[in-house]
């Protein structure tokens, strides 16, 4: 996937969700630190609407994460993580906002 960076090794049970929108890569330091102990995904937001970003995150999680996953969201990414969990509760085990 073009809109995804991975850190560590599978299984990828954690996804770090950046702020912005438009701050792709912002969560890379967090992802690198967490990857010492677990596989981490860093989805990069490319859609322009909130609905599009929720569906994009859903698609990334379904394709690449060990579900249900832990979402670590910062700023805009915290809100997006919360919305993803609300719309797709089966995909999310925990939220860290």
Regions found by a protein language model. Give the residues of each.
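Short Gly/charged-rich anion-binding patches and loops
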Residues: 29, 56, 80
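Conserved HGGG/HGGXW glycine-rich cap/lid loop of the alpha/beta-hydrolase fold
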Residues: 2-50
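Short alpha-helix within the catalytic core of nucleotide-sugar-dependent glycosyltransferases
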Residues: 28, 54, 86
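Conserved hydrolase catalytic core segment
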Residues: 67-97
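A structural signal for short coil/turn segments at secondary-structure junctions
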Residues: 35-38, 64-65, 88
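Active-site loop/oxyanion-hole signature of alpha/beta-hydrolase fold enzymes
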Residues: 41-72, 76
């Amino acid at each position: 996937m073009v809109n995804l960076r991975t850190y560590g090794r599978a299984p990828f049970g954690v996804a770090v969700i950046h702020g912005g929108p438009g701050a792709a890569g912002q969560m890379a330091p967090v992802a690198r630190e967490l990857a010492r102990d677990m596989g981490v995904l860093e989805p990069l937001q490319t859609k322009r609407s909130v609905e599009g970003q929720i569906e994009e995150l859903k698609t990334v999680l379904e394709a690449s994460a060990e579900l249900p996953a832990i979402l670590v969201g910062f700023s805009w990414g915290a809100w997006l993580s919360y919305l993803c969990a609300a719309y797709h509760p089966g995909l999310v085990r925990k939220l860290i906002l």
